[in-house]
Amino acid sequence: MEANHQRNDLGLVALTMLAQYHNISLNPEEIKHKFDLDGKGLSLTAWLLAAKSLALKAKHIKKEISRLHLVNLPALVWQDNGKHFLLVKVDTDNNRYLTYNLEQDAPQILSQDEFEACYQGQLILVTSRASVVGQLAKFDFTWFIPAVIKYRKIFLETLIVSIFLQIFALITPLFFQVVMDKVLVHRGFSTLNIITVALAIVIIFEIVLSGLRTYVFSHSTSRIDVELGAKLFRHLLSLPISYFENRRVGDTVARVRELDQIRNFLTGQALTSVLDLLFSFIFFAVMWYYSPKLTLVILGSLPCYILWSIFISPILRRRLDEKFARSADNQAFLVESVTAINMIKAMAVAPQMTDTWDKQLASYVSSSFRVTVLATIGQQGVQLIQKTVMVINLWLGAHLVISGDLSIGQLIAFNMLSGQVIAPVIRLAQLWQDFQQVGISVTRLGDVLNSPTEQYQGKLSLPEIKGDISFKNIRFRYKPDAPTILNNVNLEIRQGEVIGIVGRSGSGKSTLTKLLQRFYIPENGQVLIDGHDLALADPNWLRRQIGVVLQDNVLLNRSIRENIALSDPGMPMERVIYAAKLAGAHDFISELREGYNTIVGEQGAGLSGGQRQRIAIARALVNNPKILIFDEATSALDYESEHIIMQNMQKICQGRTVILIAHRLSTVKNADRIIVMEKGEIVEQGKHHELLQNSNGLYSYLHQLQLN
């Protein structure tokens, strides 16, 4: 009745869904009590105030249909008649709109005409204030500004060294001018000796300072690299499980590897070339003193370099994007192939896999070759501009010398100075591919670093839990346009109760436990432990107090002891052994040559499936969790190992709330209560013998199938 009443106020329904989309929990009745004063539903003003009270930033705008693809979605389409709906996605290519019908509680795809018929031009954009802060601090080139400020002393020293290098670079052409115009004309050998010694000293200082600058600069950029690498890994592990489920492993690895491109850029010559370019105004002043005409030729060439770069950069960026996409495909396919090597060998499909790899590799090589060709064209264009300027300067300079406006020494000095100006420009022009590549790398890496983590401000770390669990009016789907996985699930589990959950595949059994671990937040309803809403709880605090054993568990390439004591490496050995005995793992571990110090190999490859599963059970038990989840945990065990586990089940369950998910009904028949699920709903519950009495029930049907 309450759900139907809430469904009548579509504004309240929309607010609830948008708040939960932004990981904010709310009580609809409390919102209704505070803001729906006349009982007619939330008005526009009341809706905006209610959103503000939830730390949401909501803005009412009027937007033409043709510009809807530019707004941040999902957004609420506000209707004066109260028939509000959510706009989830705009498909501009096919003129279609993915919406969410709040009345029917289902996603809808509308054509252009259908959308125009119901759209009144009013939109409410919603974002969380935490995400606004995250967007302001997003990872891009500006991320390096605080790092530069942090190491400003080192960069200031680099700047000072660069100034001295430019002064030395200025002195050398002057020495050559003196030699050409004075020493050679007047045969001044003593002056020549002095200039030679001075020039040697300048060269030595220049080499030392240049090496010192490179060392100091590389040292500081290495620190920034360490900070970025550490930040990246911390952020990666803090991302919600949905981030990884929606992306290929190889694609994520490829994005993380883009850090290498940024590292090479930071420690390369590009940034020092920028510093050298900044001091070019000093050389221009001296060059102007020698010859304004020749200086104007040099100045006139600079826009040519810029225009050439502007012309070719967008093309290169598209080619680099394509190259990255092909590289990510290769990375994903390689990871998938190595991970599934047993299946590939067993099915003898290596030729087919090789054929697919060859095609993908050819596609990558082709895209890489196109990048190389374009980069070569760009570099040759730069060389053409440089050679053209050199010819013009030679012709004009010779005319000035012949007419007596310039001496030979001054012409040589001018050419040396112009070389000092053009050299960093050419280096940057030749490194423009690196700039483009780094820009792509920063964007790709930003996909990881700009994704919101699970850690939100204001999350509560509550006292040690007791084990009471409540699922209230739970409705959940993995994506807005995906089918409903859980629908109106209500379940109370008492502290210390052993609950079995059974049902057909896809009935929502495992999804229920994922909500309990706060991997996801329900679309509607609440998950509570000891009366505390998990949407408000710190995920790390919660998961440390829940033990989970899955059907396929992953062991790290460490010793058995380290795998069991993963959450607390300093754990006493007695606790590790006790947990291993409970899990039925101690006996086979003791028979190994190195016992608990045996390295299990990558993903536990050195152990059998049953052995890996028992170690995983020991790992879940070692922290003495108050809530224990067995999700098909014994399905991979042989009968002897399963018998050992079932014998110890009374000890395992003692003082804990236990949830057993199983297809084999023998695993759950001794549970205090058995929950039967079908199509996301609870259809039966009771003890084993009680459920068998209902001959028309699903549990009885599954029991008969297993008996037969």
Swiss-Prot record:
Residues covered by the ABC transmembrane type-1 domain: 155-437
Keyword Translocase part of the UniProt annotation: yes
Cell compartment(s), UniProt: Cell inner membrane
TM annotation in the entry: 159-179, 192-212, 270-290, 296-316, 389-409
Membrane-protein topology: Multi-pass membrane protein
EC identifiers of the protein: 7.4.2.5
Enzyme class: translocase
ABC transporter domain segment(s): 469-704
SMART domains according to UniProt: AAA
PROSITE patterns (alphabetical): ABC_TM1F (PS50929), ABC_TRANSPORTER_1 (PS00211), ABC_TRANSPORTER_2 (PS50893), PEPTIDASE_C39 (PS50990)
Coiled-coil annotated spans: none
CDD domains xref list: ABC_6TM_CyaB_HlyB_like (cd18588), ABCC_Hemolysin (cd03252), Peptidase_C39_likeA (cd02417)
Gene Ontology cellular component annotations, sorted alphabetically: plasma membrane; type I protein secretion system complex
InterPro entries: AAA+_ATPase, ABC1_TM_dom, ABC1_TM_sf, ABC_transporter-like_ATP-bd, ABC_transporter-like_CS, ATPase_T1SS_HlyB, P-loop_NTPase, Peptidase_C39
Disulfide bridge positions per record: none
Catalytic reaction list: ATP + H2O + proteinSide 1 = ADP + phosphate + proteinSide 2
Role: Part of the ABC transporter complex LktBD involved in leukotoxin export. Transmembrane domains (TMD) form a pore in the inner membrane and the ATP-binding domain (NBD) is responsible for energy generation.
Domain characteristics, as noted in the entry: In LktB the peptidase C39 domain, the ATP-binding domain (NBD) and the transmembrane domain (TMD) are fused.
Protein's recorded name: Leukotoxin translocation ATP-binding protein LktB
Primary gene name: lktB
